[in-house]
Each structure stands twice: as C-alpha cells, then as structure tokens.
Design a protein with these regions (language model features):
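Bacterial N-terminal signal peptides that target proteins for export
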Residues: 1-10
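Bacterial N-terminal signal peptides
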Residues: 9-18
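Flexible low-complexity loop/turn motifs enriched in small/helix-breaking residues
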Residues: 26-92
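N-terminal signal peptide c-region/cleavage motif recognized by signal peptidases
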Residues: 20-23
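Short, exposed beta-strand-loop hairpins at the edges of beta-sheets
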Residues: 109-127
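Short, low-complexity, Pro/Ser/Thr/Gly-rich segments in the mature regions of secreted, periplasmic
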Residues: 125-138
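Short, hydrophobic/aromatic-rich segments at coil-to-beta transitions
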Residues: 101-110
Length: 138
C-alpha cells in the first residue's frame, strides 16, 4: 500500500511539474523580430518599422508581453477590453492614444505625441500573433 501511495504521489508531482513547465514556456517565448530600413530618408517617408511574431500567443498575451518589455509602458493601457474602441487623452507621454478593434483578431493602436506618432497593429492567426510597430517622426 505504501508503494502505491509513493508512486501516485510521484506521478502527481511529475504531472504538476509538466503543467508548470508548459505554462511558463508560453510566457517566456521570445518574439521573432525584424526591422525595416533605418536610413532617415526612408523613415521620414514610411516610418521606422519593426515586425515581431509571438508564436502560440493570443492577442491579449502578446499585448501584455509587449507592454511589459517596453520602457514606455505607461503610454499603453494596463489592460485591454477586446472589441471596445477607446480614446484616451494624456496617457503617459502621449497627447492621445486610440484603440480600434477591427474584428476579434485585429487591433490597431495609434499613439499621438508632440513629436510624432506611433502605430501598433496586432494580427492573430492560428500560429500566433504578429505586431507591426511603425514610428512616424514629425
């Protein structure tokens, strides 16, 4: 009887460890990023572009990971309200931040600053979420 209890306890501990490992793996997945051209002529015409793919992450998980990684996180709301468009004045260093949902799998965020504008486009597909960031200087 003690041997059965030992094996059941060991199995329970091993199973709990697997769940914890898979949960933390999803949280610690590094995004795969690529940047567009960085010469100033291109940036003034098209903006400074960066595209990052977050594998196996939902839009909300990606938003939180992106926000957490940024030093200017105060310019993004702490939480999302899926499907609800919002305009927020004077959030962090911004003049205005707009959240516009284009369906449940697409979110467009526009941050207006005194010195320019930054856009974030979140697009979800079955393999994860892509975020395109475009910074437009004045």
């Amino acid at each position: 009887m003690d041997v059965n209890r030992f094996f059941c306890t060991a199995l329970l501990i091993a199973t709990a460890g697997l769940f914890a490992t898979s949960a933390s793996a999803a949280e610690s997945v590094a995004p795969q990023c690529e940047s567009g051209p960085r010469d100033m002529e291109y940036i003034y015409e098209h903006g400074a572009q960066t595209r990052c793919f977050y594998p196996a992450m939902t839009l909300e998980e990606t938003y939180q990971a992106l926000r957490k990684a940024r030093s200017d996180r105060q310019n993004l709301t702490p939480t999302l309200t899926p499907g609800k468009d919002r305009k927020i004045e004077n959030l962090g260093d911004t003049d205005l931040v707009e959240y516009v949902w284009k369906g449940k799998n697409n979110l467009h965020i526009t941050q207006n600053f005194p010195g320019g504008m930054t856009e974030f486009m979140f697009t979800v597909d079955k393999s994860g979420t892509t975020v395109t960031e475009i910074g437009h200087p004045d």
